[in-house]
Design a protein with these regions (language model features):
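Amphipathic alpha-helical packing segments from all-alpha helical-bundle domains
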Residues: 78-81, 111, 128-154, 164-168, ...
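Amphipathic alpha-helical segments used for helix-helix packing
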Residues: 109-130, 146, 179-183
């Protein structure tokens, strides 16, 4: 009967959805444990127990526990890609695009000061993690530079500034803010980020532009 018919691709879609849900569950379990114990003290067994999956299932998605952080990198690169689309759309000033992006980038780390500390330690102490972070930061810097270049083309960002340098300063501002917040938590991380990135945005407008970077 037509009412009971399913599209031919539906089983594949369901499998894909289940795989995505399982991967998300493993990722969330790992992030929770990294925040609680640190990455070094967390085992794959700990993660699979909390995620309620078998070790074989874990290794279907991640070769090692360190590779779980790849998922975080994917999330952040997705946030950057979305911001680039916003910038190309041209509806909002670049300063607002950057502010939204900063809040989006802070969303995952902002779940816990302990998580930020754990991630920072992993970046510093694990070569595989550090290499992946360097790669993600490089990709992110390239996307940020494209966003800032769009701002320059619109006359919203200083043309004499190198977009890649401005992108690096944006990343440094984000990292520094997250590190300080992790040591002195109080207000939510997005509030810290809004303040510091607000100062960043106030420093980059082209001469004669308003602090908000709005076009006339």
């Amino acid at each position: 009967l037509p009412a009971l018919s399913q599209p031919r691709h539906a089983p594949h879609d369901r499998r894909s959805r289940r795989r995505a849900e399982t991967r998300e569950r493993i990722f969330r379990a790992a992030m929770s444990l990294f925040a609680e114990r640190g990455m070094a003290a967390t085992t794959v067994e700990d993660i699979t127990e909390l995620a309620d999956v078998g070790k074989g299932t874990f290794f279907n998605y991640f070769p090692t526990k360190e590779h779980v952080l790849n998922a975080l990198g994917e999330i952040q690169l997705g946030n950057l890609a979305a911001a680039l689309e916003d910038a190309r759309d041209g509806t909002d000033p670049i300063a607002e695009v950057l502010q939204r992006l900063a809040r989006a980038l802070a969303r995952e780390p902002g779940r816990s000061p302990a998580l930020v500390r754990s991630l920072m330690m992993a970046h510093l102490s694990n070569d595989a993690v550090r290499e992946r972070v360097v790669d993600v930061l490089g990709q992110g810097r390239g996307i940020l530079a494209q966003i800032l270049r769009i701002g320059q083309e619109r006359g919203e960002v200083r043309r004499e500034a190198d977009p890649l340098v401005l992108a690096r300063i944006f990343q440094q501002t984000m990292f520094g803010t997250m590190l300080f917040w992790s040591m002195h938590p109080g207000a939510p991380l997005p509030e810290w980020i809004s303040q510091t990135i607000g100062h960043y945005c106030a420093s980059i407008p082209a001469e004669g532009r308003s602090r908000a970077g709005r076009r006339p």
